[in-house]
Amino acid sequence: RIGLEQFVPVVARIVHFTGYELKLDQIELEQPKDSVVGHLLGTADLVAQLADRCYLEKCRDRLYPEFVLGGIAIDERADGTVLYRSAEDLLGKTLSFYQTSARMRLENNFNRVYRYFEAFFERGRSPYIRFIRKNLTFLNTVIQNGDWNRLRRHPPCVVPDPRGEEHLMELALQRVRDWSSKQPAPPRSLAEASGL
């Protein structure tokens, strides 16, 4: 015990600023300062991920398999909605995600608190914002050229299982195969497609 247990309830709510499981306006906090802490935490989490020099490879090699296993890439509803057909499809939608979701959070929902970080950097320019732009520009080039092989970085994977990343991909591929086997076969002819 370190004597901070009274903060547990509020911290348990503040941590939701880093996720998407709740709408931000559903996070109930009594003190305005707690909302500011939530904005700072949410901003730090989002900016650190987007600025990571291996962000694109992590989306491809880790986030997509996690989305598959979590039922996000292939929706678990009866209609089997497919949001991301592949890791490349996820990356192809990342620019839109940044514009419509991440940037909206940073600029509006989190009240641009990333500006406070700028005071710590030379000439007030945040390397995080610079690296986010660099990642998104590079991704746009990869998409335009269709050259996914340019994503060559292999970020370290710190998990107890030395084959953890490989195992994650195997599980995700099995989930996709299971889903595919349940889908109706495409019609073999135009007559079959029209029900004749």
Q: Over which residues does each language-model region extend?
A:
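Divalent metal-dependent phosphate-bond-processing catalytic cores, especially two-metal-ion Mg2+/Mn2+ enzymes
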Residues: 2-6, 16-196
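Conserved, carboxylate-rich catalytic/transport cores that coordinate ions
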Residues: 9
